[in-house]
Amino acid sequence: MDSFDAPDRYVSFKGIDCEGNSRRIIDRLHMHIDDPAKTNAFWERFRAKLAIAEDPLKRQADGLCLLCANIYYIADLFEEHDDEDGLAMLRQLEDECC
């Protein structure tokens, strides 16, 4: 895909699967924060916020909003655990959806 064919969120979100991209990152994030050796108080609280985000009647922010608001913390977690695939997905999400 050349630069003219690449999705551009500033023009339109058409063709950008922000919901799917955020879901994949949330799944990837759980791979780390569900491991007791990798989690801490911040990630425990974040996991609780993700659970609330799944419930449209309770949520104040959806999963995409939580990811975008915490992108640097998530990047640090992925870097700390050498998760290059997670970082690539996160960069794509930030470029296309945040």
Swiss-Prot record:
Keyword hit for Transport: no
Biological-process GO terms, alphabetical: nitrogen fixation
Keyword annotations of the record: Nitrogen fixation
Top-rank taxon: Bacteria
A Pfam family hit: CowN
Protein's UniProt keywords contain Methyltransferase: no
Family stated for the protein in its record: Belongs to the CowN family.
Annotated HAMAP family: CowN (MF_02117)
Function: Is required to sustain N(2)-dependent growth in the presence of low levels of carbon monoxide (CO). Probably acts by protecting the N(2) fixation ability of the nitrogenase complex, which is inactivated in the presence of CO.
Protein name per Swiss-Prot or TrEMBL: N(2)-fixation sustaining protein CowN
Organism encoding this protein: Azospirillum sp. (strain B510)
Gene: cowN
